[in-house]
Each structure stands twice: as C-alpha cells, then as structure tokens.
Amino acid sequence: MGTPFVWALGLLMLQMLLFVAGEQGTQDIADASERGLHMQKLGSGSVQAALAELVALPCLFTLQPQPSAARDAPRIKWTKVRTASGQRQDLPILVAKDNVVKVAKSWQGRVSLPSYPRRRANATLLLGPLRASDSGLYRCQVVRGIEDEQDLVPLEVTGVVFHYRSARDRYALTFAEAQEACRLSSAIIAAPRHLQAAFEDGFDNCDAGWLSDRTVRYPITQSRPGCYGDRSSLPGVRSYGRRNPQELYDVYCFARELGGEVFYVGPARRLTLAGARAQCRRQGAALASVGQLHLAWHEGLDQCDPGWLADGSVRYPIQTPRRRCGGPAPGVRTVYRFANRTGFPSPAERFDAYCFRAHHPTSQHGDLETPSSGDEGEILSAEGPPVRELEPTLEEEEVVTPDFQEPLVSSGEEEPLILEEKQESQQTLSPTPGDPMLASWPTGEVWLSTVAPSPSDMGAGTAASSHTEVAPTDPMPRRRGRFKGLNGRYFQQQEPEPGLQGGMEASAQPPTSEAAGNQMEPPLAMAVTEMLGSGQSRSPWADLTNEVDMPGAGSAGGKSSPEPWLWPPTMVPPSISGHSRAPVLELEKAEGPSARPATPDLFWSPLEATVSAPSPAPWEAFPVATSPDLPMMAMLRGPKEWMLPHPTPISTEANRVEAHGEATTTPPPSPAAETKVYSLPLSLTPTGQGGEAMPTTPESPGADFRETGETSPAQVNKAEHSSSSPWPSVNRNVAVGFVPTETATEPTGLRGISGSESGVLDTAESPTSGLQATVDEVQDPWPSVYSKGLGASSPSAPLGSPGVFLVPKVTPSLEPWVATDEGPTVNPMDSTVTLAPSDASGIWEPGSQVFEEAESTTLSPQVALDTSIVTPLTTLEQGDKVGVPAMSTLGSSSSQPHPEPEDQVETQGTSGASVPPHQSSPLGKPAVPPGTPTAASVGESASVSSGEPTVPWDPSSTLLPVTLGIEDFELEVLAGSPGVESFWEEVASGEEPALPGTPMKAGAEEVHSDPCENNPCLHGGTCNANGTMYGCSCDQGFAGENCEIDIDDCLCSPCENGGTCIDEVNGFVCLCLPSYGGSFCEKDTEGCDRGWHKFQGHCYRYFAHRRAWEDAERDCRRRSGHLTSVHSSEEHSFINSFGHENTWIGLNDRIVERDFQWTDNTGLQFENWRENQPDNFFAGGEDCVVMVAHESGRWNDVPCNYNLPYVCKKGTVLCGPPPAVENASLIGARKAKYNVHATVRYQCNEGFAQHHVATIRCRSNGKWDRPQIVCTKPRRSHRMRRHHHHHQHHHQHHHHKSRKERRKHKKHPTEDWEKDEGNFC
C-alpha cells in the first residue's frame, strides 16, 4: 500500500509543478509583450508661467486592461522635490486613487486635478495662483501594483512685484502718473492678484500704492503701529478701496520678464548719472530700469554696491544679507537723498552703474502691456505660442459651446487674452479627434489669422474658406509664461451660418499672395478678448475683431512669395485689390418702427470690403525686417486718427470702383463706464488713376447702427475693421480732419505754414457734395522709403512735406434709420449755428488762415454717436480737449425724415431715444478749461453722412474739421438734461482771429473776452473759464463762488491715530496722542511689546484663557497694565474685534454701588450699556462689567466670579523710577518702569511729619508729577533738643549767635527732585 501511495503523491506533485510552470511562462510572455503602465514623458523643458497665473503641470500615462481578478486602481502622487535654488525638498502636494483626491494642508485651495474625474489616465496638476516660491522641480508618480512610473516637471515662475516711490516725495503719484512710472520702469502697474501673490510669499511694505483697478493697497505680514489699515492686527493686504485717480500715493509695479541681462559696472572712479549713461552706451547697453534690476535680483543678482539706474535713482540688489548691505532681509536696496526715505541722489553725486543689454534688441513687439483703467487690463500671451514637441489635439466634444458660462479664472478678476499671429512657427496644428486631450499643454490658446477669399471666388458665388495661418518672420526667442491654456480656456471654432463665407481651421502654411498680377491678400490677426468678472460672464467668442496688418499691392492673378510685407503707418499702397469677409457678431434689431424682440438674436454677419484700381503701385513695399519697431499686434488700442489711403498727390482722373463693407470702432477705455460696439455700414469709393480709396456710405436716407457685441467693461480696448479696409489705424504721425468738398473740378491751391502748395480734389462726376478728409500734418519716420515711393511720377509735393493735404471724397448718404422702442422725440439743441451761404471757402488748417482760389463749397455732414449721450464730434490739435454737450434721452421711436429747405448737421442716438434727422447743431471749437475732468465714455462710434440739399460752407461757423476717430483727445460732458438747452460755445482768442473776409453769420457765437483775465478767485483759487462763465477751484479750507469762505479744516478729520484737530486761520493744528508725532500725527514714535497691539497711543492684548475678574486684573497689573478701559466708540470697536466671546473689561462698582470706575483710574467718558443695564440683578452681586459678544460688545454687569477671557491695556510710554524725596520713601517695591497713569505713594521716615499730598502720577508724556510731599520733624522735639544743647554747652559758648541770627543763616536741605527740575511738568 505504501508504494502506490508514493506514486500517486509523486504524480500529483508533478502535475502541480507543470501547472505552476505554465502559469509563470504565460505571465512572462505577457510582460514581455506589453507593460500594464506606461507614462508619456513630454520632455518639453521647463514650464514657465507668470506670477499669480494658473499653470498646468502635465502628467499623462496609459493603462493596459488587467484581468478582473487582479484589477487595481493606479495611485497618483504629486511631490515637490526641489526648490528654485536647487535645494532638495520632499514636500507632498496631493495623492489620488480611485477618483478620491487628498490635498496636503499647505496646498489646499491652490491645486487640483481637473481632468482626473473624467479621464483617470490624465493626472495633469493645475496649480495657481502662482507664487514665486512655487518655482522648482515637481514629480508625478504613478503606482499600480508593483509597477511604478514617474516624471519630473520643472516649473519656473517669472515676474516680480516691487514698490516704486516718486523722486519728488512719498505719496506723490496720481493714478495716471503711477501707470507711467511703471511703464518707464519696464513694468506695468500691478494687479491685486499680483500683490496678493507677493504677500503670500512674504512681501511686506508699509507704503500705500496704486494698483491697476484704481484701488490703493499695501501688504503687511507683521502688524506694527501705523500699518494696521483695515485689518487691525491681522496680517494681510490692507486696502483703502477705490480712490479718486487724482489722489496721491506710491505705486506697486509688476515686471514680468527681463529679456536681456543686467550687469554691474564698477570703474575705478565712480560715475555721475551722465557718466553712468555714457559708460553703459560704450558697452552696447543702457542704464537698467528699476523693473529690470528687480528681475535681475529675482534671477539671482547679488551686488552690494549702489549704482545708477535709468530713472535717476540709486539702488543695489542683495540676495544674501550681510553687514553694511542694507538690512537683514534680501531685496533691492534704495539710496535716498533725505533721512525720511524720500528723494533721489543728486545727478552730480558719484556711484557705480547697473546696465542692461537686451538679448534681441530688434524684437520689441513682445508682450503687450496695456495700462488698466478699472479692473485689470493686463494682456497675457501677446506673443505667439511656444514650440511644442507634441502635436496637441482638440477634441470635438470639448469645444466650448455658446451657453457655457462657467468662469474659467479662479481669481474672479477680469483678464483679457490677446491672441495674435505667431511669427515664424513651423508647427502644424493637426487635430486628431481620437487622441487623448493634449491641447491643454503647453497652452490652450488658439492663434488665429484669417485670410480672405479672392474676388474671383466671391464673383463665382462659391463659399471661400478662411483658415488659420501663421505668418513667417524672424525667429523669436521662446518667451516665458506661455502655458495659460492649461487653465482650461478654449476658443470656439464656430461654423459659419449658411450663406456666410467665413470659418476657421488650423493650418501651418504661411499666408500666400496671388502674384502674377501682384495681388496679395494681407494676413489678418484675430484678436480674441475674454472677459471674466464678477456678476458678468463673457463668452470668449463674443468679441472677434479683424484688422488689416499688412496691406498688399498689385492686381489679380498668379502666385507670389510668402514673405510678408508691411507698410509704414503713413504709407498705404495706392492700389488695393482683394475681397475679404470676416465674421462679426451682431445684435439683430427689429425692422419695424416700434417692434422690439423679447430676446435679441445673435447671428454672424460678414464684413466685406473690396477696393480695386487698374494702375499698379508707384512704390516698393519693404519687408518687416527693415523696420523692427513696427507694431505687430493685431489689436487697436482704441479709436485712432485715420490716415489717407494714397501716398501720392491726388490725381484728377476718375476711375471709380465702389466697395462696400462695415467698419466699427470703440472709444478708449474709461473707468466706471460701459462701452458698446456698433457697426457702421461703410463703402469705399476709390477715384483717380492711383486708386484713391474714398470712404462713402450707402445711398439711403438714414444711418443704420447695429450693436455688434455685449456691453463690456470700458477698460477693454477693442477695434473692428474691415479686413481690406483702406483706412487702417495708424499712430499719431498722421492727423486727419474732414472739410467740405468743393464743387470745382480743379484743385484748390492752399498755402500752409511752410508755403508749399497742395491739391484739393473733387470730381465733377459727383453731383452730391460731401465731406473731405485732410491730412493736417504728416511726420516722416522713414524718409528713405518716401523717396522710393514717390519718385518722378509725383506731379506735386511729396507726401512727407508739411502742409500737404490729401483729400479722398466721402459721399454722404444714409441708410434708413430704424429705432427699437417707442418714446418721445427729443431735440438736443435749439440755439445752433446756422450754415448760411457764403462766397468764401477754404480749408481750416492749424496756424493758417490764408485761403486762396475761393470756390463754392458745400457741407452736409451728419455725426451720430450710438450712446445715450448724443454729441457731434470735432477734432482738435493735440493737447486740446473736446467738449460734448450732453443730452438725456427719454425713450426712442422710429424717426421719419423731415424735409428741410437747407442741409443741417444732425445728431442721432439709439440708446433710449431718437432725434429727428434734421436737427441743427453747431460745429466749432468749444472752450474747455484746462485740467477739467473729462468723461471718456462718450463717443463710442461715429458716422459721417449727409442729405441731398446742400448749402455753401461757411468757414466762420465751422472752424474745426470733423474726424471719424479721435486719439489722445478727451470728451467732456459740458451740460445737459431733459428739456435743458445744451451749450456749445465757440471762443476765438487773440491768437486765432476771425477769418479775414468772412463776416460772422446770423446765429454764430460771438467772441467773448476771457472772464479769468483778472483772476476773480480769492485765497489762491484757480479760475476755470467756460465761455463768458467761470468757476473757481478752491484750495483746501476755502469755499464759495470766489473762494471767499474760510471753512473748518477739521471737518474732514485730517489728524490720524486719534489726534485732535484744532482749526486755525488758513490751516489747522493736530494735537497728537502719546507716542505719535508729525503734523498729522502720522508718525509712530513708540511701539508695543511683542504680542501687544497698538491703537491710539495704547497697547492691548487679548487673553483667551478664562479667569475671574480679580484674577484677570491681577494678571494685567503683573504685565504693567490694567483691564482695558474704553473711552470712544473707535476704541470699543477695536477691542471688540479681538474675540468672539464675552470679555472682561476694567469697569466695576465694587467700592460704591452704581459708581462705576475704571481700574486704571481714568474717567468714565464713554458708555455702551445693553438695554436696561446695569441692573444689579443679583442684589449687590453684579459688580463687574463684561462685553457681550453677540450684541456687538455692549456692556452688562455680572458677578465677578465668572471665568471669562479678558483684554489688558497699558501705555506705550512708560515712566522711569519715581523721584527721590528727602526724608521719605516709597510704599511698596520700587520698579524700573511704570505704566502711564500709574500712581505711587511716599511715606515720611520715622520721626518726620508729612505735609501736602503724598502721591504722584505717571503722566502720558512719560514724566512724573512733581512731588508735593514735605517731611519735617515736629517743632516740640526740636525745641527740647535745642534747649538741652544750650544747657550742656553754656560754658563753652559764651559768644553764641542769637536765635534770630541762627534762623537767618540756616541751610535748607536740597531735595533730589529739584536737581531734575527739567524732567517734570
């Protein structure tokens, strides 16, 4: 039996071994074929992002399916393993497993895995708002079973926040000056999120400064006297709220990227400021700005040598604090001129220098920095997207839909994004819907550039495709902060409506141009603005704008080189051929006279613009590389002066091709205002051989305005233009005005200041008169280009010559006017300037009133503003202001044309009311006092049009040309209300007399003298003239029509820190509490012990542990204080802010019932009892007072044996030891320091009698009262001792002095306190 059993056992073991071996072999084969966990390592280098932004650190992996029996969810762990300085660190951030994410306490609220809930294989970490300390090396580790994969992602946070103080004084910058100071420091004004991020990294500065949202704030990490702000003793960013832009403060700036190197120059002999500039120039550099030095310090520069900077300040960067290098903390030190830390050193003083050398000086169009006028206006990612090694994909289901309203920025602040064309990017954006979502790294921004369809396509009626393009140019360095797309911002790829010919698709091909006929379609850049703010969510596709960046020249046919060309701002090719369409979102209006849809429909409408001319261009285009300073951004910063489309003198040949299109523009940003975008139908009619493009309006009796976007905060700059518009926006080198057209076919010779003649043209083919645009002044930034372009074919003066007028014609006609609501018709003005016939004609030119060859001139303009304030617009010389008469509207109705016998200027508005088309309004130069605050919210769009009847132009009644765009000018609401006549006064000063030979017409304004000539304002007031009226701006302390009233300066409580204001003649005086000084009690001269908080001259400390009232008072006395007393509502609020529990105070009536006293012996000056308190409820047992927390700290009397928290109070100024008194000593232990209001008592030594008061008190100024006590011996004892002495020595002193003599010569004892008379009051 034993043998069969052994055999059976052996067979069983063999089968088991074979089974195990088979299983092991199968597992080995599976492992060899594929792994279950694989991480996709990007290896794209360092991730860079700016301070206070969001960034995503990529971590992607793939998982192979496992047998159900062995399924195990992967475990994800993010860890920071190295700091920015390279020190090793092991700081856990979060762990995630099976859709459960646990975040470390120090990272809560700042990190998340946004894609993990939907896709477990995407562990991309979203981090932000970023701090400077977030820079370092991060590790993503994925573990499943025994498999372990990890990837390292370096993060670099760029940008630094710094405080800037004017050279004049502390708090010397208005909001506009603060923005300019930051700009000159190679920075922008910091946003609140920047300052908050800097504070969270330890930034502490007790100087209030402007921020981009017009608030004033400062960061405090350690509370100290004078720096409490609105947060009492708590750390945080203090805020003064939104302030008047004219108030004076310092500023906090944000410098984002260095873009070069800062190096120290320390020659053997130190340099003056001029010498430092020269020394830097000799080394191919320039003096570094303040922002550049801070960025260099942020990147590691450490130099303990003060050096000159570009703004005339002297500073030096310290990384490692050391002796004689400016303090214990790292930072950029500043050398001030005065002891109060103000003023820059004299330029003649000698220091070293810090120079800056740019890496690529030709690349000046990188990040766009726009100043903020309300909330943050910082432009992010103004350059193209960075190079990516992985092809990102956009999944179709993840495209944002129009009903998506979830905020995409966690900070809650508005943050416009500007997308522009990337210059020279060989990357192909090829969507593959099946791949994982990788489009969010390194950026989710879509870089769009639309190319218009050709005219042939449009003529054939086929749908032309618009596609995304990238224009090549010089290689640009990789810039920082290009990973904003990881925040989840996606931009919709909207399919066009049926019948529209627009669309977008990704492409890597550069823009092409049709060459054989020299036709070139200019590449366009799409500017997409995303506004995300509190209370309002904006879709990123709601504001799509087109602008011509590089117009081409030539005629149709063929292919051309893909090399881009760019024209200078004052030069536009005379022959523009092409047809482009681009979608613009419009708000559809009802067509009926009173119909109003309940819900406006949004639809896509194309913009069209075609301009063609048979003749080729008489000049040469030049590539971008020849003009590195040309702006490359496809974003208009507000309405600009428009330039003429032809560079050569006007030709009289009339070859007319009509082109239709729409062009819209928006005013510059304005705080506390809303901006609407409107589209204005515009057609361009080029005339002449050279193809002069003349802006016209379609033939119809009214103007049609369509609202093209949602109401947006006015600080966002937007501009929309037809893609082939021959009126591109330019810089201020060109000033364009409108003058009446002339009916003559020959040019009118005009002689300007320089004496050169210019041609003014109107063709005889146009029986309808209109407006002409004139170039008042053309500055020549590229003279060499002009010489090329003009050549011998120019029959008259070149374009760059001063005084040359180039006049394209504007055919003024209107489309039907349709209003959207019913309401009364409002006439804006009754008293107007009547345009009467006149034989004189000419064109108004700044500084010139010489007109030659007068011709019959006609004028019939209409200027309309699409806003509730309806106003005619005029153009002034740079530096002047435009006055706008305001008109309140009560509603709107469909206005019908009213035939008039003569043509008049019309103002119309659609925001609430409509005005009859033919209402007179004056044109002229208004009188606006300099320095008057303006409201820039007026003037959102303008249309120029005219009716059929014409009258001769009268230059006496129209002194200024009308323009379609205004730049660097301000609009001001002069007056106006419903039913109140608005005034628009025309003032002619001595420098601008009435035009010779032109009599004043009926209805024109008379010339008035200056009412401020004798300055009627008293006490230093400033006189502001407004026609015949004037107003006085009074200095502080005065009021009245002529500043004749001396008001109380103390009404505004100018004294700080509880100081008492005393009004005096022409000023005031502040009486400061102890430990404060200065003219406004703003200087803190004494502090508090550690753990104590100062308020109005006293130190307070809250103790949360509970004690009975007596024990609490005893503990406060042990700390040289008492239970707190309360003497004002401000002090009560301060004490009540400490805790949220009932708290003991020092008030009690333990000695005499109902006679409440403070334990520090101060008077009862303030009471804050609960209703029906004190009530002594326990019949004599309620002798102590408590602050009741749930009733705003009101008082109640309770028994003294309750155990409650308490607040101790003591003075900041302490008295030294009490003065010594002869024959007396102190009662109790003698201490080195005594609190304010402390009292001590003297007692006379044994055998001496006390006279006068025995106590003295420590005064609030730190000095003791003068002791009054006198200790003397009793007179009886003195007589007995004298008699005994006389009897004993009678025989020895026969010649003793008499009693009277002895008393006369007796020496009185000198008391100690008389020696220190100066120390007491």
From Swiss-Prot:
Link domain location: 160-255, 259-357
MF-aspect GO terms: calcium ion binding; carbohydrate binding; hyaluronic acid binding
Keyword Thylakoid: no
All copies of domain Ig-like V-type, residue ranges: 38-153
Domain Sushi: 1213-1273
Positions of the EGF-like domain: 1008-1044, 1046-1082
Pfam families (UniProt xref): EGF, Lectin_C, Sushi, V-set, Xlink
Signal peptide: 1-22
Disulfide bonds: C59-C140, C182-C253, C206-C227, C280-C355, C304-C325, C1012-C1023, C1017-C1032, C1034-C1043, C1050-C1061, C1055-C1070, C1072-C1081, C1088-C1099, C1116-C1208, C1184-C1200, C1215-C1258, C1244-C1271
Alphabetized CDD domains for the sequence: CCP, EGF_CA, Ig_Neurocan, Link_domain_CSPGs_modules_1_3, Link_domain_CSPGs_modules_2_4
Sequence segments annotated as region (Disordered): 362-414, 455-479, 493-518, 531-579, 683-729, 745-766, 876-956, 1275-1321
Entries under SUPFAM superfamilies matching the protein: C-type lectin-like, Complement control module/SCR domain, EGF/Laminin, Immunoglobulin
Matches recorded under PROSITE patterns: ASX_HYDROXYL, C_TYPE_LECTIN_1, C_TYPE_LECTIN_2, EGF_1, EGF_2, EGF_3, EGF_CA, IG_LIKE
Subcellular location(s) per record: Secreted
Biased composition (Basic residues): 1275-1308
Biased composition (Basic and acidic residues): 1309-1321
Predominant location: secreted
Family the entry assigns: Belongs to the aggrecan/versican proteoglycan family.
Name assigned to this protein: Neurocan core protein
Lineage of producing organism: Eukaryota, Metazoa, Chordata, Craniata, Vertebrata
